[in-house]
């Protein structure tokens, strides 16, 4: 009720929609995840996502997937729409035994081999229930084009209690560019054999890209063109790799696109 104007405003929520009392646009998902495990941080401007405390428990932030609930789902974020997504996440004080992912996918699964088309940032401390990398310390950028997989090693070593501002920008040619904390990083155009979980894979480093691309434009190479007309969904998630709860803070997630393709 607006006492100044005497106006009574009533909002009607869609029947069956999840957790609309908390947030009209987002919900939390994942193995053993509940709304009680998503809380406002007492120390920083963020939502704290905690896993429930068992191995492979997950905490995933997603747009409400109910039809008609939010523009985050009602609007299509297609690869042909010049989509730009960004978010700010903060790692916890303990970054062992966990997997973190943030970006654009078809499903909320952290496994790279699940989605044939995707573009997201990924960190994993080990290969258990995940992908086997030759190096488990950096942020990777993973994107897939109709089942062909690309893996970029950003060279950024993931640190505890640290803010990471991620941005993915897909241009009019459907080529992705990536930014971390305001700095652009090159994206490989060289495909790996495939993600299968067990086979060890190596991400193309920034130095390798610069050598084959241009040392004077070492951080500006875009990725290969993504498949046309693929509608992606923004997800941010964390999965515990042992019996201890894992957590991550999310300050914001934003997305935009061309009004008409």
Model features per residue range: what roles?
Residues 2-36:
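Short, tryptophan-glycine- and acidic/Ser/Thr-enriched carbohydrate-recognition patches
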Residues 36-60:
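Short carbohydrate-recognition loop motifs
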Residues 142-165:
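Short, aromatic/His-centered strand-loop micro-motif at the edge of beta-sheets
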Residues 199-261:
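Ligand-recognition surfaces built from glycine- and aromatic
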Residues 85-87, 162-171, 176-180:
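Short tryptophan-centered beta-strand motifs in secreted/extracellular beta-sheet-rich domains
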Residues 101-105, 120-124, 141-144, 169, ...:
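Beta-strand-rich, repetitive solenoid scaffolds
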Residues 51-138:
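Secretory/extracellular carbohydrate-interaction modules
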């Amino acid at each position: 009720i607006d006492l100044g104007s005497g106006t009574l405003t009533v909002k009607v929520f869609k029947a069956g929609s999840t957790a609309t009392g908390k947030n009209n646009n987002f919900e939390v998902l994942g193995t053993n995840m509940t709304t009680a495990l998503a809380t406002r941080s007492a120390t920083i401007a963020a939502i704290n996502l905690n896993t429930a405390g068992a191995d492979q428990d997950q905490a995933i932030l997603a747009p409400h997937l109910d039809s008609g609930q939010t523009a985050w789902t009602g609007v299509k974020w297609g690869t042909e729409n010049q989509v730009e997504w960004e978010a700010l996440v903060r790692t916890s004080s303990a970054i062992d035994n966990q997997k973190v992912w943030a970006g654009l996918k078809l499903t909320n699964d952290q496994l790279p081999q699940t989605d044939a088309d995707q573009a997201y940032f990924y960190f994993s401390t080990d290969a258990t229930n995940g992908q086997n990398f030759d190096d488990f310390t950096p942020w990777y950028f993973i994107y897939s084009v109709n089942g062909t997989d690309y893996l970029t090693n950003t060279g950024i070593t993931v640190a505890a209690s640290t803010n990471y501002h991620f941005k993915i920008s897909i241009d009019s040619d459907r080529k992705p560019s990536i930014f971390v904390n305001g700095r652009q990083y090159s994206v490989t155009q060289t495909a790996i054999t495939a993600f299968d979980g067990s086979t060890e894979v190596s991400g193309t480093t920034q130095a390798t890209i610069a050598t084959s691309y241009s040392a004077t434009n070492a951080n500006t190479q875009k990725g290969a063109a993504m498949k046309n007309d693929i509608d992606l969904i923004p997800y941010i998630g964390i999965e515990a790799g042992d019996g201890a709860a894992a957590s991550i803070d999310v300050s914001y997630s934003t997305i935009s696109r061309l009004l008409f393709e």
